[in-house]
């Protein structure tokens, strides 16, 4: 009985060590920072032409200033991860995607919606929208291929 117990204990210890190594590898290695500013076309591309579905994002913050000078920010990590994961079932998944779709809209204060601040109900007229044209916007975060 002692030999079996020692074997099971050894396997358990090895598995725990492997899980710890995998956790450290995923959380502390391979993350590359990115930063886009107002007017940039935001394109995420895999370095080795692999599927964009394997790209993951972390700590992605969209920050913008409204026409009154107030600073607003929203965490868009989940949005970007879901956009990338959406390519999983594609027959020929691309190696890049551009924020804003096919029109490749440059980063601006409307790239992500913060309800009550820059949504359609709040910015209701063309005059309101023109006030937003010179507002600064940034998108920062970390990205990696898994």
Curated annotation (Swiss-Prot):
<dbReference type="GO" id="GO:0033644">
    <property type="term" value="C:host cell membrane"/>
</dbReference>
<keyword id="KW-0812">Transmembrane</keyword>
<protein>
    <recommendedName>
        <fullName>Uncharacterized protein E146L</fullName>
    </recommendedName>
</protein>
<keyword id="KW-0472">Membrane</keyword>
<keyword id="KW-1133">Transmembrane helix</keyword>
<keyword id="KW-0946">Virion</keyword>
<dbReference type="GO" id="GO:0044423">
    <property type="term" value="C:virion component"/>
</dbReference>
<comment type="similarity">
    <text>Belongs to the asfivirus E146L family.</text>
</comment>
<keyword id="KW-0426">Late protein</keyword>
<feature type="transmembrane region" description="Helical">
    <location>
        <begin position="7"/>
        <end position="27"/>
    </location>
</feature>
<dbReference type="GO" id="GO:0016020">
    <property type="term" value="C:membrane"/>
</dbReference>
<keyword id="KW-1043">Host membrane</keyword>
């Amino acid at each position: 009985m002692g030999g079996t117990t020692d074997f099971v204990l050894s396997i358990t210890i090895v598995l725990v060590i492997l899980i710890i190594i995998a956790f450290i590898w995923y959380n502390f290695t391979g993350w590359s920072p990115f930063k886009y500013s107002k007017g940039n076309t935001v394109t995420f591309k895999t370095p080795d032409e692999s599927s964009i579905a394997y790209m993951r994002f972390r700590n992605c913050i969209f920050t913008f200033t409204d026409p009154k000078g107030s600073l607003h920010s929203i965490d868009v990590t989940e949005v970007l991860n879901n956009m990338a994961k959406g390519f999983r079932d594609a027959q020929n998944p691309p190696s890049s995607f551009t924020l804003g779709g096919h029109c490749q809209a440059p980063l601006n204060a409307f790239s992500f919606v913060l309800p009550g601040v820059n949504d359609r109900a709040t910015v209701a007229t063309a005059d309101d929208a023109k006030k937003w044209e010179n507002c600064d916007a940034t998108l920062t975060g970390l990205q990696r291929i898994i």
